[in-house]
C-alpha cells in the first residue's frame, strides 16, 4: 500500500494511513483527528474556496459516551456549527425513528437518502429527499444521498420499522437521469454503501461524476477511477477531510 502510493517512512501519511510502526509514530505525532481539527481544515478550505461544498457521509450522531447520553445532541450541535451542506445516514437510525425525525426536522442542512423508503408503502420516505441542487462556482451541482443499504441486517430493525433501505441501483440511475434532465452539470453521490459496493455502483450507474464513499472506513490518498466516476474514500472517526477540486466544463467533469 505504501509503495503503491509513494508514502515515505515516518511521514504523516505513514502514521495516518497505515498501522505499521503505529506505536512509535504515535509518540512522534500524537493525537490525530477530532472535530476541532476538522473545523480548522474546513475553515482553511472555505477561506481559499468560499464556494466549496461540505458533505457528511454519516455515522456522525453515534459512537461515543456523550453521544449515547445526549441521544446524539452533542454531535448535532457541533455539526450545526460546522455547517455542512448535506449528509446521509447509517448509525444515526439506532437512535430510533422518532429521535431521527426530531433531529432531521430541525437541521439547517439537507438530509439525503434516495434509498430510504417507507416500509409500508414501498415509496421514497418524505423526510429524506433523494437529492439537492447547489450552484457553486457557476456550476449546477446535484448531490444525491445514499444511506447504508443493509440497515435492518446490520442493526436492530425494531429501531426503525417505518423504513426500508437497499442499494436500489435502478432508483439511483433514475435519480441521476432526473437531475441531469434538470440541468445538473456535476453529479455527486454522497454514499454510505461501503467502498466495494460503491465501486460496483459506479460500474452499473452511468452519469455519476463523484462518489464520496463511507461506511468501510477506508482511507485512500487518491481517488479510484471506475469508468468515468471517481470514488473517494475518506477514512473515519474525524481523522480525515477529503478535498476534491473538480474541473467542470460544458456540463462535464474534465478533470480533478
How would you describe each model-predicted region?
Residues 1-256:
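Acidic, metal/ion-coordinating pockets
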